Amino acid sequence: MKMYQIEEVKPFMAQLLLQETFDKFCVSVAEIRTIVPIAIKGTMSHDWLSPEDAEKYKELEYIPWKLLRPVVFELIKGKQTPDFLKIQFVYYSENGDCGGLRVQFEAGTLTCLSTYTPVEFSLDRNAETLWDENCRAFLKKHEIVSTQL
């Protein structure tokens, strides 16, 4: 588990809300506090989707960010930044392990926290270390300026 403080909030938020940077992730939970607090549980309701999308996303437990991004953008767009924003991204590996990236904005500070949950308990931390490195490489690849805390 590694935490990074994002140094340039505006460019990061543009990538998060307006670009496809995070679209390969799914969202397990999102919380937004603007004029009212909003909590989004990312569990997909496959019956609500079109038949094409239901087939396309049938393997997913959580909603792809690609589908949720426009909704979140509509909730927070405007002149004021939200008081609080937290998005828990998840990414499943082929063996079922779950890597996560929690994005949190609060009191003007933006952080990302890498998380890793193996399918089975293990004392071996190689997969967790690899996920942490992949998250760091992801930030670097997308030119997201950050400092490890």
Give the ranges of each region predicted by the language model:
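Charge-rich, low-complexity N-terminal segments
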Residues: M1-I63
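Mixed-charge, glycine-accented linear interaction segment located at domain edges/termini
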Residues: C112-L149
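Surface-exposed, low-hydrophobicity interaction/linker segments
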Residues: K56-T109
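Generic structural motif
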Residues: V9, I32, K41-T43, V90-E94, ...
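Generic alpha-helix detector with strongest preference for long hydrophobic helices that associate
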Residues: M3-I6, L68, L101, G108, ...
